[in-house]
A protein has these predicted regions:
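Bacterial Sec-dependent N-terminal signal peptides
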Residues: 1-29, 493-495, 523-524, 560, ...
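A long-range scaffold signal marking pre-active-site subdomains of enzyme folds
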Residues: 25-491
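Extracellular Ig-like/FN3 beta-sandwich strand-entry sites
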Residues: 451, 528, 553-555, 565-569
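Solvent-exposed serine/threonine-rich low-complexity stretches and specific carbohydrate-binding patches
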Residues: 543-551
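C-terminal tail/sorting-segment detector
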Residues: 559, 563, 567-589
Length: 589
């Protein structure tokens, strides 16, 4: 049983919090024992909601807290037991060169956000979780209640194009038609809420950090089709807005999508990461007391990073003002934000989607250089894949892991334990513990009233044993990533049979990597074209041609077997017309 203990002063503050209903954190004497409680999906004030449309069940609260919510206890979250104890995020950045941090991470005693928009009363009846489902009656109660969500800033489909959300059945046919308004619905259930960083100073984790007026609009949705790998996933969109209470510009900002995983028994958890899948994940070191011989694995996955403009990289700054000016500057890249089929895709010429900065973790108490972030500098360092002292972890000497069948000096430590536990190659976590994990992205800026949008997912998978669960998890992550890239269009039914058409020419990192002797290479093409996929050694000599033919639009997967080759680094290149992409892969016998 895992219990959080508090000092008396903090306990008094906690009681006051409960009394004034400023937050509802269930942090005192919280047991991680598997007691399964009956719980309605929405509480009486609708300040919390249980997404349970698929195999992965996630309780949410209107201040950004996930899982660790009073009243839900340890309700089974994935099959017969729990997989996560707490979920949320950290934000860290600079205000005029002064570092700041805040977040929602209750297992680490961080609860800096309260329900509602900046300046609102947290107890206002508007500040609830709004829920709409694919099965809701068109123009019925949920569609009408969604008017209040739109008042808070929720997106909607404006069928008649008048800029006003007015869900009316214009032709009285009892069905929704394309010229009529409807809520923003993705998957089979979509939730929406707003919260902001207005927690009082005495209750903030990092005291001295003022409320900046950061407003977060959170959308979460899930798919209820049991034949789809998405049946193991819940998607999250975070829209961050700086309302300028302190400064119109917050710089060098990082966002950490965070969780405290507990796969059944919380003491036997290990961590891994996969940079090709933008994911950090948790798995068991063997059989589990709660799940038995085949415990699941679970990930924090980034689907789309924030939009950033970088002079010289994403645009040519012709007037040298550091700002992208349409019609003056030359775009070198285009960022996107997918919103689903009805709302389409937002495009930002001259920008890119920021990538993952780190896939990282820390432990509850030990070692001292990698436990709960108790200072702002801790969060700042963790966000960039560094330890509390601001140093890179050395995989060659790190006591909690080991590098197997791979040169340890070639491991990138900002992607924690990025080896492959299934094949036992690379940097692996060797000591199970009570851990927290996150995927971070940045840096980016929070400018006055300019939204910054990001997509993430929590993905689970369960196989025949603890290692096979990792393989299943990665298949489910790949399906979730493709679902996002299709703008939440085509619903995959089997990972191996997906035919999701993407709007770009893309070559993916091979998997597994390193490999022995076989690996898989995936790529997508946007239309019918002649394609070559070739493998070269480091001297540029062609080793093998894998594809040399005309292909139709879509996604492809090719197996490459290097059994007769020597160990080493190889280059694989995808080419079609003027398009070409290449990546490295490592063959280790």
């Amino acid at each position: 049983m895992k219990i959080l203990k508090f000092y008396p002063l903090f306990l008094m503050l906690f009681i006051l919090i409960q009394f004034f209903n400023l937050c509802h954190a269930n942090e005192s004497d919280v047991s991680k024992k598997n007691k399964f409680l009956n719980q309605s999906k929405i509480n009486s004030q609708q300040t919390s909601y249980l997404i349970d449309i698929n195999r992965l069940k996630i309780p949410l609260r209107n201040d950004g807290v996930m899982f660790d919510i009073s009243g839900y206890g340890t309700t089974p979250q994935y099959d017969e037991s729990q997989v996560l104890f707490s979920g949320g995020f950290y934000l860290v950045g600079k205000n005029n060169e002064q570092y700041w941090a805040n977040g929602v991470a209750t297992a680490s005693r961080v609860l800096d956000y309260l329900p509602g928009k900046v300046g609102s009363n947290p107890d206002d009846s508007l500040n609830i979780i709004y829920v709409v489902k694919s099965t809701d009656t068109p123009f019925g109660t949920s569609w009408q209640e969604y008017r209040n969500a739109v008042l808070l800033g929720a997106e909607f489909y404006d069928g008649d194009g008048d800029g006003i959300y007015n869900p009316i059945d214009k032709n009285n046919n009892g069905q929704w038609d394309a010229n009529e308004d409807k809520p923003f619905i993705l998957g089979d259930v979509t939730t929406y809420c707003v919260y902001n960083d207005s927690q009082v100073d005495t209750l903030r984790r990092y005291q001295g950090v003022p409320p900046f007026g950061i407003e977060i609009h959170q959308t979460a949705f899930a798919v209820g089709n049991p034949d789809s790998p998405l049946y193991n996933t819940v998607f999250f969109k975070y829209k961050l807005i700086n309302r300028g209470l302190v400064n119109n510009l917050l710089d060098s900002v990082y966002f950490l999508f965070w969780s405290d995983p507990d796969l059944g028994d919380y003491t036997d958890d290990l961590i891994g990461s996969d940079s090709a899948l933008n994911s950090v994940y948790c798995y068991n070191n063997g059989a589990d007391a709660q799940y038995g011989q085949n415990p699941p694995a679970i990930s924090q996955t980034m689907l789309q990073g924030p939009v950033v403009y970088i002079p010289g990289e994403t645009f040519i700054d012709n007037n040298s003002n550091g700002i992208y000016d349409a019609g003056i500057d030359i775009p070198l890249d285009t960022a996107i934000v997918n919103l689903g089929g009805l709302l389409g895709v937002k495009k930002y010429p001259g920008a890119k989607n920021q990538s993952v900065k780190s896939l990282f973790y820390y432990l509850k108490s030990t070692p001292p250089i990698l436990f709960d972030p108790i200072t702002i500098s801790d969060v700042w360092n963790y966000a960039r894949g560094l330890d509390r002292s601001g140093n890179l972890i050395d995989p060659c000497t790190w006591a909690f892991g080991n590098v197997v069948n791979y040169p340890c000096n070639l491991v990138n430590p900002v992607y924690i334990y990025n080896g492959d536990p299934v094949t036992q190659v690379g940097w692996l976590n060797t000591i199970p513990a009570d851990v927290r994990m996150f995927v971070s992205t940045g840096p980016f800026q929070l400018k006055l009233n300019e939204p910054v949008e990001m997509w993430f997912a929590i993905v689970a998978g369960r196989g025949q044993n603890h290692l096979n669960s990792i393989s299943v998890l990665k298949e489910n992550i790949f399906a979730a990533m493709n679902y996002y890239k299709s703008n939440f269009g085509s619903l995959p039914t089997k990972v191996e049979d997906e035919e999701i058409v993407l709007n770009d020419f893309r070559l993916y990192q091979n998997y597994p990597n390193p490999f022995n002797p076989e690996t898989e290479i995936k790529f997508t093409i946007p239309d019918k074209q002649f394609v070559t996929l070739k493998v070269y050694d480091l001297l540029g000599r062609e080793i093998r041609t894998l594809v040399n033919e005309t292909l139709t639009e879509g996604e492809y997967s090719i197996k490459f077997n290097a059994e007769n080759l020597t160990s080493g680094v190889y280059i694989y290149e995808l080419r079609s017309g003027k398009n070409a992409q290449a990546k490295k892969m490592i063959y280790l016998k």
